[in-house]
Design a protein with these regions (language model features):
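Ankyrin-repeat-protein effector appendages
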Residues: 1-16, 101, 120-156
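Alpha-helical segment of the N-proximal tetratricopeptide repeat
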Residues: 12-31
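Ankyrin repeat A-helix N-terminal signature
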Residues: 19-24, 52-58, 85-91, 118-124
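Ankyrin repeat structural motif
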Residues: 25-33, 58-66, 91-99, 124-132
Length: 156
């Protein structure tokens, strides 16, 4: 058991780690992970360090976390994966990184939404194109290419 003061200090350190992940402060996040903090640490909303790094486009921190065992498909309390957040935001390099580390392109959030769905909904055509090229589902490839043509036609 920890004392109240120890619990408070642990909470402060965890909050600092989440801030480092958001702000791409690799130097300080690295110190904490190397000192024993879990690369899969989650906050009160179920967001992992990787979720926050990915969502805030903190590429260096995301890569470091993945290299140190972060679960690439860890869902938050809303059922979202880091890849879903990245597809919503439209961060193609981050999307590529997560897929390189095995992110499931077709992961369902429990409401029928996938990372691909978010990319399509928010018009992230470069992300849609990348995901369609990397999906194992032939139907997804066909429909995504069709949707890409529509998006490109509507932009012109």
């Amino acid at each position: 058991m920890f004392t109240y003061e120890e619990e408070q200090r642990i909470q402060e350190l965890c909050t600092m780690a989440f801030d480092y992940a958001r702000k791409n402060d690799l130097q300080n996040l690295k110190i904490m992970i190397e000192a024993g903090l879990s690369a899969n640490l989650k906050n009160h909303k179920g967001d992992s360090l990787l979720m926050l790094a990915s969502y805030h486009n903190s590429y260096d921190c995301a890569k470091f976390l993945l290299e140190n065992g972060a679960n690439v498909d860890e869902k938050n309390d809303k059922g979202q994966t880091p890849l879903a957040g990245v597809c919503f935001k439209g961060y193609l390099p981050m999307c590529k990184l997560l897929v390189e580390y095995g992110a499931n392109i077709d992961e369902n959030n429990g409401l029928g939404m996938t990372p691909f769905t978010f990319a399509v909904m928010f018009g992230r055509t470069d992300v849609v194109e990348f995901l369609s090229q990397n999906s194992k589902k032939s139907f997804l490839k066909k429909i995504s290419l069709f949707l890409l043509k529509i998006f490109k036609r509507n932009k012109n």
